[in-house]
């Protein structure tokens, strides 16, 4: 029997958001194997996802690298794919539909658009709404696309909690990728000092940096959570967020994790996008939005934290 391929290269936040859709696709194709094509940094994490039968790594080398593209094409042919759910909907995956995984049924933004509808307009809708519409167009029931269950992605972190907190804690993510510096609020160090002062050190302030963020984290006057002097893995990261009393973050992957774990917290937004478009707000997890993140004061953020924590 032929198999199903889902494409979602990343980022971490995008993969978290796609988790419900992946579950819906697997539930719909119970008797078929479902594989995920993704980027290498997420392959180990997603290989533990119970809704997948396997993970295929795409190194996403330049398209002029014909040797790599031929190798990828030959590899995918061996999986006997009959349908592709393109949840990445990028120029790269559009290229794949034409030259790498041809002659199979594709579900993508382009196959979802209504008559006369432009992709640029469609892409303004909330991401989970778009995912739901795309799956429904293929007849897939969407019980979990907007009801994401991350219970499979947690692990026992009692050892780390004993080392760094031992009780309730506030978890901060003041980081963002190098290419998305406009998402970064510049006053986290000052905020940490004010939280400690205002709450009289009631809550340890924890930071969980990625490998390239450890030096930055060490300058922020919080407790830097490491595992054997290395950044924690994704399941440990999710578990730290899950156990936190409150989460404060830039618009990054951990924000989406906190949202879908229904944690109390704040995500700080500038004008780069909207909270609605990335489907991040809920009853407990709220966005503070300003035109320019440099204009968002420590006092405003602290006031919101106090009102939500008390």
Kindly label every feature range from the protein language model.
Residues 187-266:
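Donor-binding and catalytic core of enzymes assembling or modifying cell-surface/extracellular glycoconjugates
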Residues 108-109, 121, 228, 256-310:
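Nucleotide-sugar donor-binding patch of glycosyltransferase catalytic domains
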Residues 56-149, 169-178, 272-275, 281, ...:
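Conserved nucleotide-diphosphate donor binding/catalytic pocket of glycan-assembly enzymes
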Residues 1-12, 172:
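Nucleotide-activated donor-dependent transferases that construct or modify glycoconjugates
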Residues 149-216:
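Active-site donor-nucleotide binding/catalytic segment of nucleotide-sugar enzymes
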Residues 33-66, 223-226:
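Conserved nucleotide-sugar phosphate-binding/catalytic loop shared by glycosyltransferases and other
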Residues 7-19, 45, 177-186:
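A short, glycine/small-residue-rich beta-strand->loop->alpha-helix junction that serves as a flexible
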Residues 12-27, 41-44, 191:
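Short amphipathic alpha-helix
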């Amino acid at each position: 029997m032929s198999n199903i391929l889902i494409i979602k290269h990343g980022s971490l936040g995008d993969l978290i958001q796609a988790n419900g859709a992946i579950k819906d696709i697997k539930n719909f194709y119970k008797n078929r194997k479902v594989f995920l094509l993704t980027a290498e940094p997420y392959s180990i994490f997603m290989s533990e996802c119970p809704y997948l039968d396997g993970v295929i790594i795409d190194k996403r080398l330049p398209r002029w690298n014909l040797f790599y593209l031929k190798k990828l094409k030959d590899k995918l042919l061996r999986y006997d794919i009959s349908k592709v759910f393109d949840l990445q909907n990028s120029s790269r995956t559009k290229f794949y539909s034409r030259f790498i995984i041809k002659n199979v049924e594709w579900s993508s933004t382009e196959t979802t658009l209504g008559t006369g509808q432009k992709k640029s307009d469609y892409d303004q809708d909330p991401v989970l709404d778009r995912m739901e519409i795309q799956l429904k167009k293929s007849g897939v029931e969407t019980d979990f696309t907007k009801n994401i269950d991350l219970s499979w992605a947690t692990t026992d972190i009692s050892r780390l909690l004993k080392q760094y907190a031992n009780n309730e804690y506030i978890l901060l993510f003041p980081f963002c990728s190098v290419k998305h510096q406009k998402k970064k609020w510049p006053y986290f160090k000052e905020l940490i000092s004010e939280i400690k002062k205002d709450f009289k050190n009631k809550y340890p302030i924890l930071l969980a940096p990625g490998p390239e963020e450890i030096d930055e984290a060490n300058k922020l006057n919080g407790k830097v959570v490491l595992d054997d002097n290395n950044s924690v893995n994704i399941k440990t990261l999710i578990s730290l967020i899950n156990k936190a009393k409150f989460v404060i973050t830039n618009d990054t992957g951990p924000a989406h994790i906190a949202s879908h774990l229904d944690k109390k917290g704040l995500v700080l937004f500038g004008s780069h996008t909207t909270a609605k478009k990335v489907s991040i707000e809920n009853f407990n997890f709220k966005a503070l939005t300003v035109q320019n993140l440099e204009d968002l004061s420590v006092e405003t953020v602290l006031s919101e934290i106090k009102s939500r924590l008390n």
